[in-house]
């Protein structure tokens, strides 16, 4: 039986933007919410979660990533605003939104999806909504207080950055959190 690895495809976020998001995390932490925070170095823009795949498929996936990257130019984005999925009544994920060339980002993700279908990865069922996960909410939370925090930090904004690379990551789940390793990194354009 072939060895499997847990994988996803994402855009790496520059350290300057990560630093701003870390400041935002710290400000929200000060409000005392019970949130399992994503370590700053693990914040990324997921394009496609692949899950557990056979190691033997990595080369084919890398080719699909390369093909996708060739078809798209770098994208200008910024982190902007915050919110929760699926909604304020039952929040599970606390995220930072994006602004900028969002149409180009959706086209990039759609192309990636199409290039992976031939490798038996199903198309995403939900429409793509680019975001940066900051934390996961596991327990009940005071939704009024959370709503107030979302309003208080709604004007959060980073500087503009260029999303210029697509990366295939391996994700290892450990007791202290996920550890991400770059397997393939390809420039857009």
Where are these regions (language model features)?
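Histidine-dependent nucleotide/RNA phosphoesterase domain, centered on the 2H-phosphoesterase fold
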Residues: 1-189
């Amino acid at each position: 039986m072939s060895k499997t690895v847990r994988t996803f495809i994402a855009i790496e976020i520059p350290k300057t933007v990560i630093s701003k998001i870390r400041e935002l995390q710290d400000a929200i932490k000060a409000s005392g919410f019970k949130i399992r925070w994503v370590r700053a170095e693990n914040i990324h823009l997921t394009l496609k979660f692949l899950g557990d795949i056979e190691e033997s498929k990595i080369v084919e996936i890398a080719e699909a990533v390369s093909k996708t990257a060739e078809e798209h130019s770098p994208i200008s984005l910024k982190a902007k605003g915050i919110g929760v999925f699926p909604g304020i009544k039952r929040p599970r994920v606390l995220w930072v939104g994006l602004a900028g060339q969002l149409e180009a980002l959706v086209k990039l993700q759609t192309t990636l999806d199409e290039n992976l279908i031939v490798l038996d990865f199903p198309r995403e069922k939900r429409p793509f909504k680019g975001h940066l996960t900051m934390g996961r909410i596991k327990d009940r939370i005071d939704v009024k207080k959370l709503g107030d925090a979302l309003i208080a930090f709604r004007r959060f904004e980073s500087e503009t950055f260029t999303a210029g690379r697509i990366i295939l990551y391996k994700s290892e789940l450990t007791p202290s959190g996920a550890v991400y390793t770059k397997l393939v990194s390809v420039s857009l354009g």
